[in-house]
């Protein structure tokens, strides 16, 4: 008859289901049977394996299944040492080449070692117990050792179920020299309970000096779960977890240590999820070196009794803590465990590192009620004070303070921040170091930060504020009680209000002179700019002297003015490039025809840090009308503006009509009329605006050409141009209404061009310079909102200078090209460079 078998997935291991007709046997190694070695076949089930009296029981086979079904035995595998034995006994199950190993008991402990040794090897190992999956106990010098798996093991599952009669443990190790070592690529340790069970069910329990090591650098995944993830207590007990990914999921407590016990967690990512994440009591020690997430509804860390908790001390990992950090003692007077002090070190090392929670002390008062205290000196000599709480946030790390808190020492650096939520009233700190980082007080006038010792470099303090009358400001308080490091500086920004809310800047600053008490530091207070008014600042020197309050120009309006000014100047100065076409006509008789040129450059309005880069394409055609050459041109200009607080796009379409005449005497005249349509889209801070302008200009030049040395020439000239641009009204996205006045410009230019002709009429090289003056040039307007108004005035009038060099080549009788580079200096808007390249072809 052919037997049938089935495979059932249990956790991360494979459980072999055997036919009921298979007869199970027990393997016993003792003085009666001696050492026993059993080779089993696949499908064969062993009832139990037992070694005692210093003997060894060995089971080998391709797959191994041990299943205890009798309540009398209370174990599936046991190695035992009697008091009269000479040494420990030993059980060996499988070897690294064994496939599936299933060990299960319907009653008691699946694997139990009493002062002896048990080793289980295989590719996939599953251990199921009703009370305990693994139990190791020792009080002898030789110890008790359980080894489960090897680096070649693919998966290990250790599980137990607590019922109405027993507690449940995934791993239970007790006693000095009691050791458990579990290896595998994936490891799962779990403890659960039946619905009626009232006892404990803990993933790992190591007490009285036992040592448990789970995982290695080759372990990819390790999970522990139970009502308590792990409990480690008494007499230097220890648990070590190592894997790439570690998950501890508990109903009550994730990690619980006390009485000089130690826990070490080393990995790439560790998640602890439990109402109470980490408990460290009575000289115990918890060290975590891993990207860490602690999610706790009650407390992420609870410590007391000179214990220590160290999280990512090497500053190489990210840390996320959701929950409070608590220093607690529940011991009344006259009882042990009263010392509340402990060393807790939390490092928030990067922008992904965030602690959201509060920190406080809690203990029983004289009436026996638990109270919460956030004072550095809690006033209770019996419990003492906490002195070892250290927090470091750097490289963008964040502490979100959710309630009244204290910390002994805080270091905040390199873009990190402390954010005090609105429901936090008090933060007490003994030593605070702030280096290029910020403290954000979001709670208003009831919030207070008290610091004993401060060292601040490029430190920012943001304080939520309010005002009812625009003259008096209500905000919280930041004070240093003992000492300030020499050279400290602090920038204080009052948030929640803007300069638009202030009627009297000096009175407003006077009202907050005592809200930041940091004697010996340089303090600059700032009220941020609004939509219309600029920021308000006041400086307090280290000696306590105060400057007067200053109101700056609004940067958004300044940028909007700058973009408008730069765009107007760019269009105004385009006239020079159409005039250059007429220069070409003077230089080359019969050069009329179709032509095109491309020019572009960069101009700057330095008062607002506006840089405008433009590119223009211009095409035209001209012909003779008697002794005159007349023509028309069309151009399109595209511009991009970069601002310190935004950006803008400009476009201009321009139609030009021109005429030029060269007299035999060397006198020349030309005239130019233009119409343009200008469009601008600009964003500065929270201000987005779009507007259009119509632009007109008319002008002309007169000059005289003097030729000498046969090929050299000089051309003094004078020009006059009038421009008119219609204003536009628009409403920006922040509600500011801008009303532009019409713009007029009357520009006179006095200049000279000089150069020499190449031989055989091949072209020429020239330089030019001019002085220009705008007799009008005032750009005016108004920005208004909510009863406030600010001027949009810019004066583009005055004098500036233009200079440049150029060249021209006549390639054939019909084809010519030219190019030049120009600069302007001295005006409100300066042209850093303008480059032009042109082509003329006669058909």
Residues covered by each model-derived region:
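Outer-membrane translocation/initiation segment of Type V secreted surface proteins
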Residues: 435, 444, 457-481, 488-624, ...
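Extracellular beta-strand/loop-rich repeat segments of large surface/secreted proteins
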Residues: 308, 322, 327-510
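Outer membrane beta-barrel transmembrane domains
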Residues: 647, 656, 660-661, 708, ...
């Amino acid at each position: 008859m052919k037997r049938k078998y089935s495979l059932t997935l249990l956790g991360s291991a494979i459980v072999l289901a055997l036919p009921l007709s298979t007869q199970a046997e027990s393997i016993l190694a003792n003085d009666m049977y001696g050492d026993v070695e059993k080779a089993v076949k696949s499908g064969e089930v062993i009832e139990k394996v037992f070694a005692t009296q210093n003997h060894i029981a060995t089971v080998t086979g391709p797959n191994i299944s041990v299943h205890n079904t009798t309540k009398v035995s209370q174990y599936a595998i046991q190695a035992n040492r009697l008091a009269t034995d000479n040494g420990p006994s030993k059980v060996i199950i499988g070897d690294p080449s064994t496939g599936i190993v299933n060990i299960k008991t319907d009653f008691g402990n699946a694997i139990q070692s009493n002062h002896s040794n048990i080793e289980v090897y295989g590719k996939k190992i599953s251990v199921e117990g009703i009370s305990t999956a693994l139990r190791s106990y020792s009080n002898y010098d030789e110890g008790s050792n359980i080894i489960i798996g090897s680096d070649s093991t693919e998966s290990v599952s250790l599980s137990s179920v607590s019922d109405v009669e027993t507690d449940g443990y995934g791993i239970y190790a007790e006693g000095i020299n009691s050791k458990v070592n579990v290896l595998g690529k994936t490891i799962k340790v779990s403890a659960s309970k039946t619905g009626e069970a009232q006892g404990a069910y803990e993933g790992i329990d190591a007490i009285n000096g036992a040592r448990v090591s789970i995982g290695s650098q080759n372990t990819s995944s390790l999970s522990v779960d139970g009502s308590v993830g792990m409990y480690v207590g008494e007499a230097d007990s220890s648990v070590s977890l190592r894997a790439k990914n570690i998950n501890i999921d508990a109903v009550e407590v994730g990690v619980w240590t006390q009485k000089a016990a130690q826990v070490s967690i080393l990995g790439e990512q560790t998640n602890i999820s439990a109402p109470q994440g980490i408990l460290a009591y009575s000289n115990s020690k918890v060290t975590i070196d891993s990207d860490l997430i602690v999610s706790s509804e009650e407390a992420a860390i609870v410590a007391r009794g000179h214990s220590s908790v160290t999280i990512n001390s090497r500053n190489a990992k990210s840390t996320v803590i959701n929950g409070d950090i608590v220093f607690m003692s529940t011991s009344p007077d006259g009882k042990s465990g009263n010392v509340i002090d402990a060393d807790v070190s939390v490092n928030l090392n990067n922008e992904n590192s965030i602690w959201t929670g509060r920190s406080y002390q809690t203990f029983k008062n004289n009436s026996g009620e638990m109270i919460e205290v956030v004072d550095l000196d809690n006033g209770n000599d019996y419990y003492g004070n906490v002195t070892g709480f250290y927090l470091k946030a750097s490289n963008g790390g964040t502490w979100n303070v959710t309630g009244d808190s204290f910390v002994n020492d805080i270091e905040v650096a390199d873009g990190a921040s402390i954010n005090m939520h609105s429901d936090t009233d008090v933060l007490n700190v003994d030593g605070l170091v702030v280096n290029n980082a910020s403290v954000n007080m979001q709670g208003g006038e009831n919030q207070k930060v008290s610091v004993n010792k401060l060292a601040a470099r490029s430190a920012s303090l943001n304080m939520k504020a309010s005002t009812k009358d625009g003259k008096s400001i209500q905000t919280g308080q930041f004070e240093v009680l003992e000492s300030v490091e020499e050279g400290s500086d602090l920038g204080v920004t009052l948030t929640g209000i803007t300069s638009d809310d202030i009627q009297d800047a000096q009175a407003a600053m006077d009202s907050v002179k005592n809200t930041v008490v940091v004697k010996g530091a340089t303090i600059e207070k700032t009220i941020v700019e609004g939509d219309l008014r600029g920021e308000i600042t006041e400086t307090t020197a280290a000696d306590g002297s105060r400057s007067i309050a200053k109101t700056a120009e609004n940067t958004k309006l300044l940028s909007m003015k700058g973009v408008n000014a730069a765009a107007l100047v760019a269009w105004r100065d385009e006239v020079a490039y159409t005039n250059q076409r007429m220069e070409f006509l003077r230089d080359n008789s019969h050069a009329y025809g179709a032509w095109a040129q491309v020019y572009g450059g960069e101009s700057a309005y330095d008062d607002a840090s506006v840089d405008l880069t433009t590119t223009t394409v211009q095409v035209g055609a001209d012909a003779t009308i008697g002794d005159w050459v007349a023509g028309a041109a069309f151009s399109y200009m595209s511009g991009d503006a970069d601002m310190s607080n935004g950006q803008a796009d400009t476009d201009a379409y321009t139609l030009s009509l021109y005429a030029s005449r060269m007299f035999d005497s060397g006198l020349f005249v030309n005239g130019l009329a233009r119409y343009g349509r200008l469009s601008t889209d600009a964003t500065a801070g929270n201000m987005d605006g779009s507007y259009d302008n119509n632009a007109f200009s008319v002008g002309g030049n007169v000059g005289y050409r003097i030729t000498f040395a046969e090929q050299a020439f000089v051309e003094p000239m004078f020009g006059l141009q009038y421009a008119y641009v219609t204003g536009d009204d628009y409403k920006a996205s922040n509600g500011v209404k801008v009303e532009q006045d019409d713009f007029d410009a009357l520009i006179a230019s006095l200049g000279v061009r000089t150069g020499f002709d190449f031989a055989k009429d091949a072209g020429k090289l020239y330089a030019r310079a001019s002085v220009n003056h705008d007799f009008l040039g005032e750009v005016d307007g108004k920005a208004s909102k909510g009863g406030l108004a600010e001027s949009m005035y810019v004066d583009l009038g005055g004098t500036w200078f233009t200079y440049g060099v150029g060249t021209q080549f006549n390639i054939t009788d019909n084809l010519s090209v030219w190019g030049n580079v120009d600069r302007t200096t001295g005006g409100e808007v300066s042209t850093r460079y303008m480059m032009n390249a042109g082509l003329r072809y006669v058909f």
